[in-house]
């Protein structure tokens, strides 16, 4: 079931609790469809169309705020196991076939300010950043009740794409002016693009992808978030919030607990996917942050490879407090992992709805 814009925004901003939201954020990992076919899955189950969710009707404005005018990808080497290529940014990347969904950079284009100045033109504003008929298409989507989204590059993620994680972290201390210049350029372009967009259409949702943490914690601490990322985020979010945008949603895997306060101060008010294996317990997060932070995800994907009793226990722990407090679109915390039995996924969906319906009925939610 798709939920209209007004209902989704009322729910995710704590204005009105209603029957719970439920989604699949990322879908199956690369080999899982073959596993499920061998277990008798229908085509509709492979595409997840057979399963019941409740999530917003959404629309992404056709626009670009990040890297543009890249080179055409060039395949350097291809074997049965991997592909090595030069990507749009000029990076040499390696993709492991049958095991990965994203190519891993083997080298990066930026090491210092001189390198960055060669790349910087790809981040400057021009008219190509607006998709064809973007305004008319967005107005049509809004009239149909769709939730309107715009996106910016990550304050950690985009410099990481240019420099790599290790070099970026060193640069915060050894070349801070470089990181400031990168994010200042990105912010300037994002503001110019989104100023025009938000002046013409109602933007509801700002999305940013970071993926800046692992199981043991984030690669930036609160001080780095405050120094480098907050000024960038605030330039964009303050503009959009003044014009009626309501959700600023950050996507970051791993343990983000040490920097959540810093990111809330930077404007974030919604996070996903909330990975339990990394210590992101949505029950504890809700208890700590209350109505300051909406949540998406939070159900442990790994439990689906265990017993049905363990699946039920995970759902009984997570679902009741989220249904009671609202502003949480429940779902798995990442890709459905390889090795997940089809029967377990069917059970997970049915059991989740059983518990959500029970709790919603108990609370009298509509």
Residue ranges with predicted function:
Residues 1-27, 32-37, 83-86, 95-96, ...:
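Active-site loop segments of alpha/beta catalytic cores
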Residues 69, 79, 85-87:
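Beta-sandwich/jelly-roll carbohydrate-recognition scaffolds of carbohydrate-active enzymes
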Residues 72-77, 100:
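A structural signal for short, hydrophobic beta-strand segments that form beta-sheets
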């Amino acid at each position: 079931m798709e939920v209209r814009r007004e209902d989704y925004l009322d729910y995710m901003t704590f204005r009105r609790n209603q029957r719970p939201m439920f989604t699949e954020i990322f879908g199956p990992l690369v080999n899982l469809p073959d596993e499920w076919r061998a277990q008798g899955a229908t085509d509709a189950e492979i595409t997840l169309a057979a399963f019941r969710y409740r999530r917003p009707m959404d629309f992404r404005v056709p626009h670009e705020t990040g890297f543009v005018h890249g080179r055409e990808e060039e395949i350097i080497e291809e074997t049965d196991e991997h592909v090595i290529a030069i990507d749009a940014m000029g990076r040499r990347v390696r993709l492991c076939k049958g095991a990965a969904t994203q190519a891993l950079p083997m080298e990066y284009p930026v090491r210092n300010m001189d390198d960055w100045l060669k790349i910087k033109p790809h981040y400057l504003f021009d008219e190509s950043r607006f998709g064809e008929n973007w305004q008319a298409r967005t107005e049509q989507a809004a009239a149909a009740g769709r939730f309107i989204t715009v996106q910016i590059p990550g304050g950690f993620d985009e410099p990481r794409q240019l420099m790599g994680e290790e070099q970026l972290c060193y640069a915060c201390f050894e070349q801070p002016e470089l990181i400031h210049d990168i994010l200042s350029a990105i912010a300037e372009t994002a503001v110019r693009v989104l100023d025009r967009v938000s002046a013409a259409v109602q933007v509801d949702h700002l999305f940013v992808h970071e993926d800046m943490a692992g199981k043991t914690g984030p690669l930036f601490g609160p001080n780095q978030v405050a120094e480098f990322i907050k000024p960038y985020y605030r330039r964009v979010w303050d503009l959009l919030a003044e014009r009626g945008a309501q959700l600023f949603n950050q996507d970051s895997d791993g343990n983000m607990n040490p920097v959540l306060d810093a990111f809330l101060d930077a404007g974030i008010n919604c996070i996903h996917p909330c990975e339990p294996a990394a210590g992101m317990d949505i029950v504890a997060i809700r208890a700590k942050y209350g109505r300051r932070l909406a949540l998406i995800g939070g159900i442990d994907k790994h439990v689906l490879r265990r017993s049905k009793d363990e699946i039920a226990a995970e759902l009984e722990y997570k679902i009741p407090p989220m249904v009671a407090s609202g502003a949480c679109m429940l779902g798995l915390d990442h890709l459905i992992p390889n090795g997940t039995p089809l029967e377990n996924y069917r059970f997970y969906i049915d059991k989740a709805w059983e518990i959500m319906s029970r709790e919603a009925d108990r609370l009298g939610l509509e």
